[in-house]
Amino acid sequence: MDVLRSIQKEATLEPLLNNIYNRLEKITNSKLLDDKNKVITSFLNIKEYLKKASAENSDFWEASARSFAYSLIKTFSASLLLDHAQWSLENNNDDFFLTISKRFCNQELSPLIYPNKEYIDDSLSIFNF
C-alpha cells in the first residue's frame, strides 16, 4: 500500500516507468539480450496490468498492492543490474555482474495477481482483523 500511496501522491509512476524503458533501450551487449527481453516482458506486463487495473476499485488495488510493488521493484532492479553489467563488461571486461544479473533475471519478475471477488473479500477480512 505504501508504494501505491507514494505513486498516487507524488505522481512517480510514469517517470519510473520511463526510467526503466530508457535504461533497457541502452542495453546492447549480446550477452545481456536474453535477460533484457525478460525485463521488457515484465515491463510490458506491468503496463498491461495498469491498463486493466485502472478500471478497478480501491479494493482491487489494496488486494493486489503487494504483487504490484514486488513486480515494480523487481523490474526496476533488473534494469539497474543489466545496466551495471553492461557497464562492467564494457569498462572492466568483467563478467561478474553479468552472472549476477542473469541470476536475478532468472526469476519471475512480475508476479502480478488479478484478484477475483473471493480473493478481495479474503484480503479485506485479513486487513480488518
Language-model features: where?
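Flavin-dependent oxidoreductase catalytic core characteristic
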Residues: 1-129
